[in-house]
Amino acid sequence: MSANTTTTDNPIYSDYVSRNSLSVSPQLCEFIETEVLADLPIDADTFWQNFSELLNEFSPRNKALLLTRENMQAAIDQWHLNQIDKKDKATDAEQIAFLREIGYIAADVEDFTITTDNADDAIACIPGPQLVVPVKNARYALNATNARWGSLYDALYGTNVIELPVAKKGGYDSFRGAEVIRFARHFLDQATPLTNGSHADASGYTIHNGQLSITVNSENIALKNAEKFVGYTGNADAPKSILLKNNHLHIELLFDNTGVIGKDDAAGMQDIVLESAITTIQDCEDSVAAVDAEDKTLVYRNWLGLMRGTLTTEFKKGNAIVARGLNEDREYTSPKGNDFSLSGRSLLLVRNVGHLMTNDAVLDANGEAIPEGIMDGIVTATIALYDMQKRNSLHNSTTGSMYIVKPKMHGPEEVTFTCDLFSKIEQQLALPANSIKLGIMDEERRTSLNLKACIHAAKDRVIFINTGFLDRTGDEIHTAMEAGPILPKELIKDADWISAYEASNVVIGLQCGLSGKAQIGKGMWAMPDEMKAMVETKDGHP
């Protein structure tokens, strides 16, 4: 909701219940006390006391940061207006000096390397796709979480990556299917090449003495890099699947001589499954409409289901009712004959809202709607205790961390505020320092200009930085509104400053030591029907 003040005198809030110094929506209150705290070593009185302390300490700071934004923007607007009638326009150097004078450009920081530890491998060292999904929708939340593994054949057959007319409904298009298989085998030749020949000519895959053997033209051929074979299922002489690995990502070859595809394949290969959505942001912000207590309760309830491993949903597909829950882990046998498992689920981050929004699901001691980001912080972190304390079998983090993405922060002071908030929450929940990791979204102009200082402010807990065209462009337009006309959207995409923004994000991230410890993300793709364009666009990112 907006930042308007609300009071307990308003009849809308007449049924709110008193907790510590707060007035709380009965729906949210019941959810917290009977569902969130049900199996945690935290009683309701302690939770609400912690919540009240957070608001007392951080609400004034939150308001002060927003006032700083307003004052800086007013100064920038006036500076641009002052240039209109000047014969000699200000130089770039003069504009930079002005921005430093008002504190918009922060003081430089010395070179440093982030010290984040206990980040899961999915964050620290596995490169791959990251999904963003509205956590308010249980079906979408589950689909994204379960997208850790996906069929390459399906992805190619059902999208325009393959340069053929999209398959018609009502049956299998064998011509398109053949092109999918050709494309996929070429991918295998690139990712896991053979010492001789091609995967396209393979007629069998078996394991002998812990080594993968591929039959090509009646000869037994090995992988050029034998270490890329990491596991299998079934029998060694007739495996159900072969597990390969390239660039930290797994590739699973599935075999079924009776399958629709496998029966016509020389090697009996039915599908190729790729490790796909390595991480997923369960979103409480941009992709959801959560404006009141009812909405927020649903958002938090679904997050609770994910952290407890219990989230399920049902939906109708044709004439059948389909039930969906979280995928189990995937079991394999190593080349040496040892059993091991891989997560069947995407590693989850949760995006809280930024510093601007307030929400009247809880009213403070003055009857005002509270900063929603503070509420998101304490509630999502408390819920994450179920995973961090290993209270479920379908775990998220294996390192005892939780991951909060914080959007729309303006500069290092706002990042410092977030880190201080997280530190306080960690103390309240008896968590080790820096257990709550932070994703910094580089989507505001003041953050881009001060990215190194922003990362420095969170150097002990930062686990990603990323870019985003729409929000970053929007803030550029808003900030420079009085500077004159700006390019149309399509032309902005090719503007020098956008390219510089993307490149700078990567360079600064690497200079600050994010490689091997944190993610550097490259914006969101919101056009699922344009997969070919996505592949081409992402290939061009720095």
Question: Where in this protein do the model-derived segments appear?
Answer:
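Generic, well-ordered alpha-helical scaffold segments in large soluble proteins
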Residues: 27, 31, 35, 50, ...
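Conserved, mostly hydrophobic/aromatic
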Residues: 47, 76, 404, 440-443
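Short, internal active-site loops enriched in acidic
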Residues: 407-411, 442-447
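Domain-level signal for soluble alpha/beta catalytic cores
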Residues: 2-4, 10-16, 22, 38, ...
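Catalytic alpha/beta active-site cores
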Residues: 2-15, 94-97, 101-417, 424-431, ...
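Active-site capping/gating regions of soluble enzymes
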Residues: 186, 190, 422-433, 445-542
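N-terminal-proximal low-complexity accessory segments that begin disordered
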Residues: 5-86, 92-106
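Charged, alpha-helix-enriched surfaces in structured cytosolic catalytic cores
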Residues: 23, 42, 67, 71, ...
